[in-house]
Amino acid sequence: MPLSRLIINNFRNLQSLDLELSPNFNFIVGHNGSGKTSLLEAIFYLGHGRSFKSHISNRIIHYQAEDFVLHARIDEGQHQWSVGIQKKRSGDTLLKINGEDGNKISDLAHLLPMQVITPEGLTLLNGGPTFRRAFLDWGLFHQYTEFYSCWANLKRLLKQRNAALHQVRSYAELKPWDIELAKLAEIVSQMRASYAEGLRPEIEKTCQFFLPELEIGVSFHQGWEKGTDYAEILAQGFERDKAMGYTMIGPQKADFRFRANGLPVEDVLSRGQLKLLMCALRLAQGEYLVAQKERQCLFLIDDFASELDPIKRELLAHRLRESGSQVFVTAITKDQLNQMQWQESEQDSLFQVQQGMLTK
């Protein structure tokens, strides 16, 4: 679903922009601090209701304004959507889809599936399991309509159980939570396992394209011993959980692990190889979405040239162009975009950014 138009008001140093966008590649060139990453951040905010750089909304609102407003037009074949989001310094948020209020962030996220590739994105590989669960759950959200409600209810029950652990004296008092929690945990884990197994061949194929010298393996770990009953584990671990004050075992501990030639990737790959593997994983997931749901996702790539040599940049550009996705790419200079051959395509757009102002 490509964005055909983007309006930004008072988002960081971007005070007033109205952009007509290419459905193919959109290149954003500018010096550090010019506002090029803020443009990607604004697009991300439209699809997630949050920033990928800051959790404090007042830091995102322009210092001279009381709110920021983002608006976009989304085109998909014969269908068109108008989406908008306003965030005030007070913390209030207003969402609109086709002019109607009462929408949720999940509604925006469903309309705008997107993958983000940033220098900080290596946490997918060398960070904690939280980042890899988020990777899996992104795919589940877009593939299974029932996943979001199951996941949200699971989070709610875990929070309630953890609070109850500080109050109950016996397991009998906690058991009503555990009955429902165990059911949801099994459902979410089964969806995660099924999705991970379906995604695995796509990951292996894409990694072979980018890193043919390595054998990349993936494995899903549900967060408790496979083949055991989660309800029994909760009951057996009651005293331990009560002493710790939280639920130690379960789907909230799930992981999706990556190995290179049988070893953890974070232990054996260089920074450049990790960056390429991260790109491969994001591309594989986007292509799997197309294969399963016939839906394209956007790709937001910040600092395209970072830690990739010219040959690897060409490989990434080739694969992105083959995907047919809408892509937004930032770079400091035009020369860094040579591997993407932007000069040869009249269907691409090139924007120059300087002090929050864009010229095409």
Swiss-Prot record:
Gene Ontology molecular functions: ATP binding; single-stranded DNA binding
Binding positions for ATP per the UniProt entry: G30, H31, N32, G33, S34, G35, K36, T37
A GO biological-process term: DNA synthesis involved in DNA repair
Annotated compartments: Cytoplasm
Any Gene Ontology CC annotation: cytoplasm
InterPro entries: DNA-binding_RecF (IPR001238), DNA-binding_RecF_CS (IPR018078), P-loop_NTPase (IPR027417), RecF/RecN/SMC_N (IPR003395), RecF_2 (IPR042174)
PROSITE patterns named among the record's database cross-references: RECF_1, RECF_2
Broad class of the protein's primary localization: cytoplasm
Similarity remark: Belongs to the RecF family.
HAMAP family: RecF (MF_00365)
Function: The RecF protein is involved in DNA metabolism; it is required for DNA replication and normal SOS inducibility. RecF binds preferentially to single-stranded, linear DNA. It also seems to bind ATP.
PANTHER family: DNA REPLICATION AND REPAIR PROTEIN RECF
Name the UniProt record assigns to this protein: DNA replication and repair protein RecF
Organism: Actinobacillus pleuropneumoniae (Haemophilus pleuropneumoniae)
Encoding gene (name): recF
